[in-house]
């Protein structure tokens, strides 16, 4: 009786490894990284978009204002992070599709392409803002640009926080690209 059972098990062959669980886990990790990137990029855009400070000198009539929309690099930063955050929100259904159907390769190719584009957009926005913040903190004596962060401390600190959140979003996006690339590479025979 024992030989008959073992013979029938050999005829069926070995059971395939549970590949679906591993790919589903990668899909869940992809979804969580997207949520973190959404939080980072949208909080960066909102923080920079609400950054302003007013200083009063001598009387109420002399006021100096620092606002994000006075600098085109900060406007670009807000727009770039809003675009990336919007893309990430729109990519969530595709990420959910990768959890439900872990073998869907075409959606991975779509995500890896657009995630790479969003890395570039987010990095360029953050780099532009960092350049302005450097001049705001250090100044430039050759061009007579004075450091304003000693006076507008709250403005600069809020802008630095926004740029830090944006660079965190860049890191999450890079991790998403690497995750999608490794998933696609594992699909090859």
UniProtKB/Swiss-Prot annotation:
It is found in: Cell membrane. Glycans are attached at residue 52. It is a multi-pass membrane protein. Residues 47-73, 130-158 are extracellular. Keywords: Cell membrane, Cell wall biogenesis/degradation, Glycoprotein, Membrane, Transmembrane, Transmembrane helix. The chain crosses the membrane at residues 26-46, 74-94, 109-129, 159-179. GO terms for biological process: cell wall organization. Residues 1-25, 95-108, 180-189 are cytoplasmic. Its main location: membrane. InterPro entries: CASP/CASPL (IPR006459), CASP_dom (IPR006702), CASPL (IPR044173). GO terms for cellular component: plasma membrane. Regulates membrane-cell wall junctions and localized cell wall deposition. Required for establishment of the Casparian strip membrane domain (CSD) and the subsequent formation of Casparian strips, a cell wall modification of the root endodermis that determines an apoplastic barrier between the intraorganismal apoplasm and the extraorganismal apoplasm and prevents lateral diffusion. PANTHER family: CASP-LIKE PROTEIN, CASP-LIKE PROTEIN 1U1. Belongs to the Casparian strip membrane proteins (CASP) family. Homodimer and heterodimers. This is Casparian strip membrane protein 1. It comes from Picea glauca (White spruce).
């Amino acid at each position: 009786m024992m030989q008959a059972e073992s013979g029938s098990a050999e005829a069926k062959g070995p059971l395939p490894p549970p590949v679906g669980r591993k790919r589903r886990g990668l899909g869940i990790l992809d979804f969580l990284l997207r949520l973190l990137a959404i939080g980072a990029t949208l909080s960066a855009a909102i923080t920079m978009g609400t950054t302003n400070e007013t200083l009063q000198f001598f009387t109420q009539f002399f006021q100096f204002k620092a606002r994000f929309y006075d600098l085109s690099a900060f406007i670009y930063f807000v727009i770039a992070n809003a675009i990336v955050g919007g893309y990430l929100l729109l990519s969530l259904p595709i990420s959910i599709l990768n959890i439900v159907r872990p073998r869907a390769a075409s959606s991975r190719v779509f995500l890896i392409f657009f995630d790479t584009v969003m890395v570039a957009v987010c990095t360029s926005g953050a780099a532009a803002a960092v350049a302005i913040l450097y001049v705001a903190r250090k100044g430039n004596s050759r061009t007579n640009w004075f450091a304003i962060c000693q006076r507008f401390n709250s403005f600069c600190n809020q802008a630095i926080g926004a740029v830090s959140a944006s660079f965190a979003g860049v890191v999450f996006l890079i991790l998403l690209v690497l995750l999608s690339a490794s998933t696609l590479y594992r699909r090859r025979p």
